[in-house]
Structure formats: C-alpha cells, structure tokens
Curated annotation (Swiss-Prot):
It is an enzyme of class 2 (transferase). Its EC number is 2.3.2.27. It comes from Seriola quinqueradiata (Five-ray yellowtail). A zinc finger (C3H1-type) spans 18-45, 48-75, 155-182, 311-340. This is Probable E3 ubiquitin-protein ligase makorin-1. Pathway: Protein modification; protein ubiquitination. InterPro entries: MKRN-like, MKRN1_C, Znf-CCCH_4, Znf_CCCH, Znf_CCCH_sf, Znf_RING, Znf_RING/FYVE/PHD, Znf_RING_CS. SMART domains: RING, ZnF_C3H1. Keywords: Metal-binding, Repeat, Transferase, Ubl conjugation pathway, Zinc, Zinc-finger. The keyword Cell membrane does not apply.
C-alpha cells in the first residue's frame, strides 16, 4: 500500500510538474472550479493570502453582504487620500468680506441634497444643486488642479461663460465669467452685451439655421404622403429605412421610390428608349437623381440636379480610369475625367464625316442614349441600298427552300414591308415549298 501511495504521489508530481509549487489564485480567492483536479497547489500554508478588499464595502454599499468573497474592512487612516486644497475664484473681491469659518465640522453634501434643490423654471437660469445661500463665505470654491496663475478678473469678465451658453451655470451671479444676453432665436445666453459684431454674427447664423430647419420641415410635410407609382407603397412608410428614398426623374414629375425606378431602368428585355422613359407618361429621362425628400417644383429640381452633378463630378470615372480606359458617355459623363497628374480631360470637338448614304456620322464618342436614339431614328433600309438587300433576301430564300422539308414554312420580310418610320410592317409574306 505504501508503495502504491508513493507511486501515485510521484505520478501526480510528474503530471503537475512545476505548477504544483504555485498556489492557485482562484483557490486563494475562495473559488476554484477545478477542485482536486486543479494543476496548481491548493496549500495555503506556504503562500501569502491576497488582500482583496471590497471596494463597494468601502463606499458603503455591498449587495453581497456576508456572502461577499472579498474582505470587508475600512481603509486605514494612512491610506486615505488627503482632501484637495480649496481656493477661491478670482471673483472673491466682488463678494465682499467673508465671515470666519465655523469651528465645527463642515456639513458635506449627502444623498438628501436633492430635496433642497432649486426649482427649475423655464426661461430662467438653472442653479442646480449648488447651495449658494448656505455658503458661509459667499464665495464659490474650486479645487486646485494645477499651479498655473489665475487670469485677471477683468479678462474673465470679458469672456462668455461656456456653461451659461448651453443653459446652465451653477454659480449664477457669482460666476467669474460674463453671462450673455438671451438670443430670442435659440433661447441661449450667447449674445455678448458689448460686442456688436458677435451679436450680429450669431443672429445671422441663427436665422440661417432656422430657415434651413423650416425647409426640411416643409420637405418632410411634402414627402410624407407620396406613393411610389410602381410598388404602390408610401415611400416614407417602407419597412426598410434604406428604401425610404425617392428617385427623381430629370424630365418627369411622377413619383417613384429609388429602388423601383432603378429596377425598372435596369431591365434587359426592353429597348433603351423604353426603359429610360417614365412608366406612366413615357417621357424619356436620361438619369435619375436620388433624393431623401420629394421634389416637384421646377426650380428646386434644377437645384437638386445641379447638386447631384456637382457631387458626381468629384468622383473619378471608373470607365475613364485615369486615361487608361474609354468612357462611353464622353464629355457628357457626370463623373470626373482626370489623369494621374490631376489634369482634366479636354472636351474633344465633334468631327463629321459623310458615309455612303450621305448621312453625317459622329466619329467622337457619343453618349449611350444618343447612340440608341440614333439607331431608332435611322431607317432600317435606305433607298440606294434596296436593290442589294433584295438580292440578298432572294439568295436566302433559295437556300432555305433548298435545305427545308416538304412541310416547312418560310417567313420572309421583304424591303417593301418597311414603313416610312423605319419599322417593319407586321404583315409578312409567307412562302410554302411545293411538293
């Protein structure tokens, strides 16, 4: 048995290794979830217990009470921090002579000071919990945080109090700084009594901010009931906040949300002229302007378009790619065409050249919508090329008749079916191969 115990002790020593000589810090604090299986030592005879003092008990409130695993003891007197030295503000000379301090202990504000707090009256300076009337010396005190000399009282009286400027100063009339006049626009004490320039600048800034807020209010009022013409939902009431944006068409005044109109214009099964037109009135708009609010007035829309173009003009064009690529929109592109050295692309003059059909062709890059419009407006068959097209169609007909089956039906669209607008007549000529 003795040999087995010695073997187990040796095995445990090998398993634990050097950690068995280190006291478990969790066990020292009274909590180790490993128990007997812990790799560290649970022997407190050779270890100094940790002095873990409960900081909540020192503050007077520990919810664990006797069950707290930290030590409940008050700090020694030599460990208490010295009280900060109190110095009067530079406005002490304005407060008059002070009475001698009482010999008894000075009452420290406790948790019941809120009972005697000053009543808050709208439009009046809020004094907070400062008991100015009970201060024996009638002088506000501040803690000495640094050794820099205090500024002159005359200099302080020329500066506006930063606390009164936001609506609250605990020192009231005893403040060393100057309390400005109340601005009738913002209701804050930010107007300097003697500086007319500061008063005029602040009043101007307040009026501009007020006008901007009113414009936003009118825009919200104008936009809150607008319904998208595609999804038939109120834009401001969409479930996803990111979808509460309008897609303003440049040449149309119909209302659409940005998601729906972009989806409409990204369709691939229709021609460009169709997808670029309004779904309701069919007026073509070359671009869509994202907007947080609905804009219908002509002047406001022009301002929005110009703001949109200015914003796009500050972003580099990914097609131009600093001169390495080619942008299909050319000089009409909204994005910035700049080279790596910062130079902007110069607008290239349009060069005209005459083709075989006596039509002017533009050799310069043309915007995509102009390309589509030119393609739609161009006749599919020209008069001078009609004989050549007829000959080619005849050859195609002969090839189909030679390679087709007995029951095969061949549909041919001859040049005579072309209308004056360049589109083919829906009626076609049908040929059936004879047996």
């Amino acid at each position: 048995m003795a040999e087995a115990a010695a073997a187990s002790t040796a095995a445990s020593g090998v398993i634990g290794g050097w950690t068995k000589h280190v006291t478990c810090r969790y066990f020292m604090h009274g909590l180790c979830k490993e128990g007997d299986n812990c790799r560290y030592s649970h022997d407190l005879t050779n270890s100094k217990p940790a002095a873990m003092i409960c900081k909540f008990f020192q503050k007077g409130n520990c919810v664990f009470g006797d069950r707290c695993r930290f030590e409940h003891c008050k700090p020694a007197k030599n460990e208490e921090l010295p009280a900060p030295q109190m110095l009067p503000l530079p406005s002490a000379s304005l407060a008059g002579p002070s009475d001698p301090e009482p010999s008894g202990p000075t009452p420290v504000p406790g948790a019941q000071d809120w009972v005697n707090a000053a009543e808050f009256v709208p439009g009046q300076p809020y004094c907070g919990r400062a008991e100015q009337a009970k201060v024996e010396s009638s002088v506000p005190l501040i803690e000495e945080f640094d050794s820099y000399p205090a500024p002159d009282n005359k200099q302080l009286r020329k500066q506006l109090c930063p606390y009164a400027a936001v609506g609250e100063c605990r020192y009231g009339i005893n403040c060393a700084y100057l309390h400005g006049d109340v601005c009738y626009m913002c209701g804050l004490q930010v107007l300097h009594p003697t500086d007319n320039n500061q008063r005029s600048e602040h009043t101007k800034a307040c009026i501009e901010a007020h006008e901007k807020d009113m414009e936003i209010s009118f825009a919200i009022q104008r936009s809150k009931d607008m319904m998208c013409g595609v999804c038939m939902e109120v834009v401001f009431e969409k479930a996803n906040p990111s979808e509460r944006r309008f897609g303003i068409l440049s040449n149309c005044s119909h209302c659409y949300c940005l998601k729906c109109i972009r989806k409409w214009r990204s369709a691939k099964q229709f021609e460009s002229k169709i997808i670029k037109s309004c779904p309701e009135c069919r007026i073509t708009s070359n671009f869509v302007i994202p907007s947080e609010y609905w804009v219908e007035d002509k002047d406001d829309k022009q301002k929005l378009i110009q703001k949109y173009k200015d914003g796009m003009g500050s972003k580099p064009c990914r097609y131009f790619d600093e001169g390495r690529g080619t942008c299909p929109f050319g000089s009409n592109c909204f994005y910035k065409h700049a080279f790596p050295d910062g130079r902007l692309e110069e607008a290239q003059p349009q060069r005209r050249q005459t083709g075989s059909n006596s039509r002017n062709r533009n050799s310069r890059r043309t915007p995509l919508w102009d390309i589509y419009d030119e393609r739609e407006s161009t006749d599919s068959f020209d008069n001078e090329d009609e004989e050549m097209v007829t000959f080619e169609l005849s050859e195609m007909l002969l090839m189909l008749l030679a390679a087709g089956t007995d029951d095969e039906e061949v549909i041919i669209r001859p040049p005579s079916c072309a209308t004056s607008s360049g589109r083919l007549d829906p009626t076609v000529t049908r040929y059936r191969k004879a047996c």
